[in-house]
Amino acid sequence: MMRLCLVEDSGAANLEPLTLTRATFDLMLGTSTLATKIARAFDIGPGPARRGAVIRTSLAEVQRSRDPHTAVNDRDWLGRGEVVVANGRWVPPADFDASGLFGGSAWVGLCEGRPACAWVGPEYAADLEPNCVDDWFDDLTSKVECSDIGGEWIDRPWDLVAKNSAHIRRDFEQDAKVGLTNRHLSSIALIGPAERLFIHETARIDPYTVFDTTNGPITVSAGA
């Protein structure tokens, strides 16, 4: 069973004030969090046996309350087997293919020359500690094979703003959201391509609401 551990490096400080009360990987980009994008890239689902995190100790209790199914700063969990360790500020490329990356010896994946993720056994994973992630990656890159895997970094708060539009489009395409019910079509005004608009069947839309998809997709989520 594949496992994923999301980690925070010293770059979390450069994302303040957004990261004062949340982990870096809980920041939104497009229509999902950075954590969701990383987990999707590696095709790793939720659950306490599959997800872990190494974050600032000041946020540990808050994170456990928000996400009780993730093992937070849990060295025992880290030492139970092989695991993908991913920097929570890394955004995998849209065409990322994780198949064939696992098994065999440990490796480090680089993005723009910086460690973005790694596949390691328990002998390395158990050494992960809060506030020491940079040193852990530096040590690992000196011992195992490293290769470029692409992607991009979220280094500053304004990166989320600058990249948001492109990721809204990317998320819409990856989610393959299509279709409007006749009920919605009969009550809205649409400007632009209909295939760029997704309205969940449970969403309540006031009559004659105008949706303009000329410049990009629009998603109305469940319960809206």
Protein language model features and the residues they cover:
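Terminal amphipathic alpha-helical/low-complexity segments used for targeting or macromolecular assembly
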Residues: 1-195
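A structural motif detector for beta-strand N-caps
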Residues: 182, 188-189, 197, 202-209, ...
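Active-site-adjacent "gating/activation" loops or surface patches in catalytic cores
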Residues: 214-216
